Regions:
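Conserved, well-structured ligand/cofactor-binding cores
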Residues: 1-477
Length: 477
């Protein structure tokens, strides 16, 4: 991947040697080496704007703290802060070309941010890019920091902001299910267990059930996200705080709280926090739980809409596109299907996060880059999936009310409602005879004079079969 190529270059050097960097690039030699070393995926940092902004926020917090400790000049601080604010405004994001999946525990990403901010700060100070004696990526932008605290802090902030977006999309989807629950509240249908007829319920109860299980996952997701607000900024390399002054961590956290408005806290034990990635493990797991529930719901939607003539056919999903290149007139449930696939991808990403989480060794987990990429990707997939499912499927679902009513009338499952009155033994006989003869339960109960028509109608009223009721009815014999 090549960025900002031009004929003019500037020479930059580091431990490995000197390289020619495009003069038009805000990034420097560290980023250039990262581009060359990590041609791994198509997931690049510039595709994750909230992460880039979180990196800028982290550097702003550090700059404010360093200025208060008189470790940066006022001119350097002002220029660094202005450069970071431009990044927050969406500028310079094309200058973050590195692969999200990289060796080095995130050093390439951290240095990409340091170099972009330093070179833009140099311009604001009236200097040329690369004149690092005036504002250095390492000595000034990265002052009092290590990749091992700045990078995970930025991940936490970026993922928390991503979470805030995700829950809005999620809540809107849940509300769509609630609306369908209200719309279909009057439609009686058969409930099913193990894909066999069970007892009656309403179609509204089905959709409200979907909403309720998702609301529970929304709460769980929000609970897991709170761990992102605890950071290890000030830990530097391994948690001892080497190269940082005693008051730095406290001042940096205060600055981050002010900049973000978030309740950011410093971890109690910086040694432990520096190697601990459990917040990503926990949040990815919460997204996996959402994916599992979405799979169940989408599978149910596909079953409920199966047919159109030889399936359950209780609901109609919006027809989005022809379903077959060979079968004329066939329309498939493509939107629930794509949400299924989104869910499988999220579940797969969670396995990657879990395995990477247990890969920490000693005082650091070098697998944070792929963990972060998986978490950001899963959240993006879910947001897109939620919106697609809501707008192209849920909002347009209609009910086949007569089909639902007819299935209840013909079902043997309604015999369950007779249990409290005529007993399990007699109910079983009625069910068996209905299966053998093809007659309905209603017809057989009257035929055998087990109940009066009035009592039978009372028991089998839809409103009496979809909730707990107390009926004072006795059999004829």
């Amino acid at each position: 991947m090549e960025q900002n190529l031009s004929k003019k270059t500037r020479t930059e050097s580091n431990l490995i040697g000197s390289r020619e960097v495009p003069e038009s690039a805000l990034y420097g030699v560290q980023t250039l080496r990262g581009i060359e070393n990590f041609r791994i995926s198509k997931f690049h940092l510039n595709e994750y704007p909230l992460f880039i902004q979180a990196l800028a926020i982290t550097k702003m917090g550090a700059a404010v703290a360093n200025r208060e400790l008189e470790l940066l000049t006022e001119e350097q601080t002002d220029a660094i802060l202005k450069a970071c604010k431009e990044i927050l405004e969406g500028k310079h994001h094309d200058q973050f070309p590195v692969d999200m999946i990289q060796g080095g525990a995130g050093t390439t990403t951290n240095m990409n941010a340091n170099e972009v901010i330093a070179n833009r700060a140099l311009e604001l100070m009236g200097h040329a890019r690369g004149e690092y004696q005036y504002c250095s990526p390492n000595d000034h932008v990265n002052r009092s920091q290590s990749t091992n605290d700045a990078y995970p802090t930025a991940i936490h902030i970026g993922l928390y902001y991503t979470h805030l977006k995700l829950v809005k999309h999620f809540a809107t989807l849940i509300e769509a299910f609630r609306k369908k629950g209200a719309e279909f509240a009057h439609i009686i249908k058969m409930g099913r267990t193990q894909l066999e007829d069970a007892v009656p319920m309403t179609l509204g109860q089905t959709f409200n059930g979907f909403a309720s299980i998702l609301e529970h996952e929304l709460k769980n997701l929000d609970f897991a996200a709170q761990d992102f607000l605890t950071v290890n900024m000030g830990a530097t390399a391994i948690g001892t705080g080497i190269t940082a002054e005693p008051e730095y961590a406290e001042k940096c956290i205060a600055a981050l709280r002010k900049i973000t408005g978030l309740d950011i806290k410093l971890a109690d034990d910086l040694i432990g926090a520096t190697s601990d990635t459990s917040c990503m493990v926990g949040y990815s797991s919460a997204m996996r739980r959402v994916a599992v529930k979405m799979n169940k719901i989408c599978n149910d939607l596909r079953l409920l809409a199966s047919g159109p003539r030889c399936g359950l056919g209780e609901i109609n999903l919006p027809a989005m596109q022809p379903g077959s290149s060979i079968m004329p007139g066939k329309v498939n449930p493509v939107i629930p299907e794509v949400m299924n696939q989104v869910s499988y991808k999220v579940i797969g990403n969670d396995l990657c996060v879990a395995m990477s989480g247990e890969a920490a060794q000693m005082e650091l987990n070098v697998m944070e880059p792929v963990m972060a990429q998986c978490c950001f990707e899963s959240a993006d997939l879910l947001m897109n999936g939620f919106d697609t499912l809501r707008t192209l499927c849920i909002d347009g679902i209609t009910a086949n009310e007569e089909k639902c009513r007819r299935d209840v009338h013909n079902s043997i499952g309604v015999v369950t409602a007779l249990n409290p009155v005529i007993g399990y033994k007699h109910s079983t006989k009625i069910a068996k005879e209905a299966l053998e003869t093809g007659k309905g339960v209603y017809e057989l109960v009257l035929e055998h004079n087990i109940l009066s028509k009035e009592d039978l109608d009372t028991i089998l009223k839809p409103e009496n079969m979809i909730k707990p009721v107390k009926l004072d009815i006795h059999p004829n014999h």
